[in-house]
Amino acid sequence: MKVNGIHHVSALTADAQKNLDFYKKVLGLKLVKKSVNQDEPTMYHLFYGDEVANPGTELTFFEIPRIAPFHAGTNSISSIGLRVPGTEALHYWKERFEEQQVTHSGISKRAGRDILAFQDHEGQRLVLTADEEGKGYGLPVKQSGIPEEFSFRGLGPVELTVPYAEPTLHVLTNILGFTEISREPVEGQGTAVILESGEGGAATEIHLIERNDLPRERQGKGSVHHVAFRVRDEEELAGWHRIISREGFSNSGIVERYYFKALYFREPNGILFELSTDGPGFMVDENLDELGQTIALPPYLEHRRAEIEAKLKPIQ
């Protein structure tokens, strides 16, 4: 069995409203679900994605008010990739970032593709990748204020930085079924091992960097919490549960998240991996034109709606 690319990436923010202002209004992503952290429902969990909330397009944020800024280092998910249609789109975004005073590093190359690295208002590290192959899922967001020919298509390569690459590489290749396709220099970072899964292409890639000269990352606002990989359905997820357990990894067991089912475990360098089913998806409780408009709760939290909403600061 092999995973089928990136399902979603989840990160941390200290302010849900400022997060929404940046990711929806500046980047033009669609808020596809305004919900809460199911393990701590007093905090927002915001899901952004493409026009129809396809798996493989979702970038999510847990709000933790007053959380301290992160300190960059190893044992971390060190950047999040977002795919755009091509290099022409990168030039559009470079101009837009300059107009919006977004910190960026200019257009460069990574793993054979043109990229534009940038940071959000909390220092979250992101990379726009020119996806000339176009293998990944993703439909342009309508009414986003961004021309469709330049707009977000979905998640791109996810970068991991670890002090010792070999144990993580073993998990990715020998357990999860990734394939190493090349080793590429990354400016200021040494060499990245480029791995792909599923159908291949930018939407399925992990870039693994070994840095034993850095301290361990301290998580906070601007850091990434976990990366999730796609699996077909609950039956396949049950098979993964058996495999992960057999390999000796402590894990969560299968967790009901309503919009998908999930399995969590930490790889040897401590990075949190999740395996998530493609379905049932984010339209199980809202129509397309309703996505992200109101606070959505899974049925097992619905009886606490009044209590939960009273503790959340309204955002729009």
Curated annotation (Swiss-Prot):
Signal peptide per UniProt: none
Cofactor: Fe(2+)
Transmembrane residue ranges: none
Residue positions binding Fe cation: 8, 226, 274
Record GO biological process: catabolic process; response to toxic substance
The VOC domain, residue ranges: 5-131, 154-278
Pfam family membership, one: Glyoxalase
Keywords: Aromatic hydrocarbons catabolism, Cytoplasm, Detoxification, Dioxygenase, Iron, Metal-binding, Oxidoreductase, Repeat
CDD domains in the record: PcpA_C_like, PcpA_N_like
EC number per UniProt: 1.13.11.-
GO-annotated cellular components: cytoplasm
Cofactor note: Binds 1 Fe(2+) ion.
Highest taxon, organism lineage: Bacteria
Family from the record: Belongs to the extradiol ring-cleavage dioxygenase family.
Name this protein carries in UniProt: Putative ring-cleaving dioxygenase MhqA
Gene name for this UniProt entry: mhqA
